[in-house]
Design a protein with these regions (language model features):
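Sec-dependent bacterial lipoprotein signal peptides
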Residues: 1-17
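Aromatic- and Gly/Pro-enriched helix-to-coil junctions and flexible linker segments
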Residues: 18-120
């Protein structure tokens, strides 16, 4: 059975068009006029990236739980949480431990939430 090689060209084009070019393509963009809130924007970031260790109670040597609004707010205000998620993998204290660095737009979102006064 012979296969028409022209069939492969459209197939390759379809496959290539399904790729993304940046991490921002993978994350829903937020309306810049909308206030950043813990419940809608910040909690999902921490739930997806932090509570494997920073649960209640914290495990794997994690020093604090990051499961509630007050836990996260206090960690940002009283520890170097934002610095630790900003560091590059391999730096001592980098978070998430053993994971990959959060996309910059998520780090920026957390910083913006802080600058807007930690809206719940």
């Amino acid at each position: 059975m012979k296969t028409n090689p022209l069939f492969l060209v459209p197939l390759c084009l379809i496959i290539l068009s399904c790729t993304n070019t940046s991490e921002k393509d993978l994350i829903e963009q937020i309306d810049p006029t909308e206030p950043i809130t813990y419940s809608e924007h910040i909690k999902p970031v921490f739930d997806s990236n932090c509570i494997n260790c920073h649960s209640s109670p914290a495990i794997n040597g994690a020093g604090v739980s990051l499961t509630t609004y007050n836990n996260v707010k206090n960690s940002i205000e009283n520890t170097n949480l934002i610095d630790r998620i900003n560091w590059q993998p391999g730096q001592g204290g980098f978070m998430p431990l053993g994971g990959t660095r959060l996309p910059q737009n998520l780090i920026d979102l957390i910083i913006q939430w802080q600058s807007e006064g930690f809206v719940e």
